[in-house]
């Protein structure tokens, strides 16, 4: 038991001793740490003081440096300002001197002006005096004298001017005619169409003459109903087994012709049946119109047209101009324009498109007011055609200036198609009037003895006085006559003016 107590006391004493020793060690360490901290603080304070001193020194140096730089810049600015002030003073002095010089010049100019005015008045007075003396001596006014001088100069130099004009024209025509002939010949020889002339009547063959009476009907009711529905004249005469449909509108005439053929084939002819067959014939013709328009685009290779434009193209199949079928004419113009464009190296597709559509307005010109070119341009504008194509339509009859080479080509192709022999027919009365007018224009010129229109009005031969007109002036006269014909006369194609100067000398041997 005692052993346990002593052991416990030993442990307790050991613990107390350990505690005391540990406490002393800790206190000793704390004292050392405190001293170290004091040393660190002192070192830090010393270092901070040194840094502060260094910073102050550096700041002072920087401030001094900035002050020196500012002072230097200030001096430079002052020097620059002083220099500018000196320049300004010098410039003001120069301006002042210039003002003085200008004042002197103005005074001098004013004196000169006054002197010139006085001289002008003196000259006018002298001119008036001389004019009065001239009028007294010559007996004519200055205006008359001026006219005499101008007339003398005109007569003197007219020959020289005409000679130079003739030389220039000859050189130009020699080259341009060769090239133009080559282009047109190459185009024409690659396209040679055939045409059959259109007329204003259509004939329908009947199986027998009894059918004529059935077409007339009781008291003429059938023929009256037919003419009312179709808008044509049905001519029934003594010609055996044949009747004639007459109408200026080929479309109505074609529908009427098909209506009669259907009535004859059906055998039942009365007003109601006439109306039924008319509607069927009308539907057939509408189909033909669409097919004709599509065929025209296929033949020419023109694509991308609006369906309504294709339909209007088809209507041209039943439209004529001077006896020429307008659809065939449009196809021909498109193909010729394409060939010429190919020869000249311009846009073939545009030329073909413009050529095919150039007369599209004729499909509606019976129904809408205005020229066919204006109507056609409005149609193409409505269905989205380009401005260039519209210009081709307007320019082919001169209602607009052509803006592209293709527009000029289309106009030329149109003229070629129209001028081709046999392509068109004219009314006899209009034809005769045009020939008379052509000869009158040629005879209106001075020194013309006579004039004759030949070659169906496509050439006029002018006989001149040989002692008044020489070869050079004859060339000028032909040009002047051609210009006047262009201004006063409308005609298809190209018209040739030939001036003939013939000198005959006669002597008799006895």
From Swiss-Prot:
Domain HD intervals: 326-419
Keyword Cell membrane: yes
Compartment annotation: Cell membrane
EC number(s) given by UniProt: 3.1.-.-
Superkingdom of origin: Bacteria
Enzyme class: hydrolase
Protein name listed in UniProt: Ribonuclease Y
Family: Belongs to the RNase Y family.
GO CC, alphabetical: plasma membrane
Stretches that traverse the bilayer: 1-21
InterPro entries with a match to the protein in the record: HD/PDEase_dom (IPR003607), HD_domain (IPR006674), HDIG_dom (IPR006675), KH_dom (IPR004087), KH_dom_type_1 (IPR004088), KH_dom_type_1_sf (IPR036612), Ribonuclease_Y (IPR017705), RNase_Y_N (IPR022711)
UniProtKB keywords: Cell membrane, Endonuclease, Hydrolase, Membrane, Nuclease, RNA-binding, Transmembrane, Transmembrane helix
Pfam family, one: KH_1
